[in-house]
Amino acid sequence: MSEKSRKTVLVVDDEPEIRKLVAAMVTQFGYAVLTADSGDHALTVYKNHKAPIELLITDVVAPGMSGPMLADKLLELQPDLKVLYISGYDNTQVVRKYVVEREHALLAKPFSAADLKAKITGLLRPEVHSTVRHAAPRGGKRAG
């Protein structure tokens, strides 16, 4: 994947170990990664980045600005931004309000690299605009 065609992911977590681990996994998946340790820092990183950011990965619970608050602010600036929340807490309200109503995604901690990759791939998958192809044989003849 060329540097220009790589999608950019912004990883935000106040815990350095989690942030570094998630960033390393996302880099291994072939994406360009930006990191921030807080919502305010993430807004600064976003504003200083010259190209669009395709995906925000953020912890739900954070000191200062929560993940959902950060997502709301970034979505005002870039409405097509995809959002993946990661959390180790029971997030019933978050799931209802953000994941279901706003079509964001949630990944519960602990998670594997495969779990993270599947969520990212699902969120960043290009919209499929192709015609349906039918595999029915022509003329109704069976081989045999």
Regions found by a protein language model. Name each.
Residues V12-D13, A36, L56:
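Conserved sequence signature across two-component system core domains
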Residues K20-Q28:
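Charged docking surfaces used in two-component/phosphorelay signaling
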Residues G30-D37, V45, L107:
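Short hydrophobic/Thr-rich beta-strand motif most characteristic of the beta2 strand and flanking loop
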Residues D37-H41, S66-L70:
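Acidic catalytic/metal-coordinating carboxylates
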Residues D59:
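Active-site residues of response regulator receiver
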Residues A62:
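Receiver (REC) domain active-site loop signature in two-component systems and cognate sites
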Residues M69, K73-E76, D80-A108, A114-T121:
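Alpha4 helix (beta4-alpha4-beta5 surface) of REC/receiver domains from two-component response regulators
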Residues T121-A136:
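The C-terminal output helix
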